[in-house]
Amino acid sequence: MKQKIIIFGGSFDPIHNAHLYIAKHAIKKIKAQKLFFVPTYNGIFKNNFHASNKDRIAMLKLAIKSVNNALVSNFDIKTKNAFSINTVNHFKSCYPTSEIYFLIGSDKLNELEKWDHIQQLKDLCTFVCYERKPYPFNKKIANQFNVKYLAKCPLEIASSKLLNQPRKKLIPLAVLNYINTNHLYLIPTLKAMVDDKRFQHCLRVGKLAKQLAIANKLDAKRAFVAGAYHDLAKQLPVDQLVNIATSELKITNYPSWKVLHSYVGAYILKNWFGVKDKMIINAIKNHTIPPKQVSKLDMIVYLADKLEPNRKQEQWSGGIEIDQLVKLAKSNLKQAYLITLKYVQNLVKD
């Protein structure tokens, strides 16, 4: 009996639970001895990827521990390969007596006739297709290329949609922890949550927070992440913002809905995205109305938000020397924080 090998290619940026469901189902239905996840090379089309080749492989290796007979191949990445024919030929040479199956989604099925070397591929391997919404299984194209129907995938997950959706139930826990430990997807997540003007503000806050952290001998990367994410929830619809604040966080007493984004942003990072770093969570939560007891990171994010370079052009800063306060914050963080806090509080009273 011939050994059966499945090739499952894709960006896996990141790998998620739908990928794992499909892999397990394919192995079972085809009775395959091996399934290889083959991440696409991130080279020519760099803008299409958010995580590096190294990180995507690392996440795959963590994820496949739950899939029997699954392996990760770096062939496409190692050889900078962009053509499926090369991938299939590689596996044919490694397993010359095996049956090769090439796993695709119904979205790719519709493009199959446009693939390079499609007739050769048809002869070298058997295409198997899983159906994913909103792309129905195209029987006409399937018959043309002898594509076997696998099943419908009940999990509607797309890697691109994970940027502004709750991730905790959609991504394997080990992968989620890897993402958060290495602060992956920060930039695309911000871009998915806020408009460009707010995004640029977040980056400036992150960069200034990093500078202040370095000057105060604190974790620069943590400060950048907290600063960049501080306005994560700033542009949520008001009704959603208020609903999360009142229903999930039980906040009932607040001066204006405009301050709720700090609490909701911290909630989203923790409960949607699985961030466990309490210092980052608290710094974001405390950046609008700081409590009496604040950490150094709290002070840094608060200051970076109020003193980032573009604040000079804004009306609120008319009576405050931003450059001088930034300089002071690098040598005496607490003093700079107290001066800025008092100024802002007086401004609000007026």
From Swiss-Prot:
In terms of InterPro entries, this protein maps to: Cyt_trans-like (IPR004821), Diverse_Catalytic_Enzymes (IPR051094), HD/PDEase_dom (IPR003607), HD_domain (IPR006674), NadD/NMNAT (IPR005248), Rossmann-like_a/b/a_fold (IPR014729), YqeK (IPR005249)
Q: Which Pfam families match?
A: CTP_transf_like, HD
What role does this protein play?
Catalyzes the reversible adenylation of nicotinate mononucleotide (NaMN) to nicotinic acid adenine dinucleotide (NaAD). Hydrolyzes diadenosine 5',5'''-P1,P4-tetraphosphate (Ap4A) to yield ADP.
> What EC number(s) are associated with this protein in UniProt?
2.7.7.18, 3.6.1.41
Q: Which reaction does it catalyse?
A: nicotinate beta-D-ribonucleotide + ATP + H(+) = deamido-NAD(+) + diphosphate; P(1),P(4)-bis(5'-adenosyl) tetraphosphate + H2O = 2 ADP + 2 H(+)
Task: Please give the knockout or disruption phenotype noted for this protein.
Answer: Probably essential, it was not disrupted in a global transposon mutagenesis study.
The name this protein goes by in its record: Probable nicotinate-nucleotide adenylyltransferase/Ap4A hydrolase
Q: Please state the span of the N-terminal signal peptide per the UniProt entry.
A: none
Output the Gene Ontology terms for molecular function. ATP binding; hydrolase activity; metal ion binding; nicotinate-nucleotide adenylyltransferase activity
Binding positions for ADP per the UniProt entry = 201, 231-234, 261, 287-288, 305, 311
Keyword Kinase, does the record have it? no
What segment(s) does the record annotate as region NaMN adenylyltransferase? 1-187
Q: Where is the HD domain?
A: 198-310
Give the family this protein belongs to, as stated in its UniProt record: In the N-terminal section; belongs to the NadD family.
Q: Does the keyword NAD apply?
A: yes
Binding positions for Fe cation per the UniProt entry: 201, 230-231, 305
Named in its record, the pathway it takes part in is: Cofactor biosynthesis; NAD(+) biosynthesis; deamido-NAD(+) from nicotinate D-ribonucleotide: step 1/1
> What highest taxon heads this organism's lineage?
Bacteria
Q: Where is this region: Ap4A hydrolase?
A: 196-350
- What keywords were assigned to this record? ATP-binding, Hydrolase, Iron, Metal-binding, Multifunctional enzyme, NAD, Nucleotide-binding, Nucleotidyltransferase, Pyridine nucleotide biosynthesis, Transferase
What the entry lists under HAMAP family is as follows:
NaMN_adenylyltr (MF_00244)
What's a BP term from Gene Ontology annotated to this protein?
A: NAD biosynthetic process
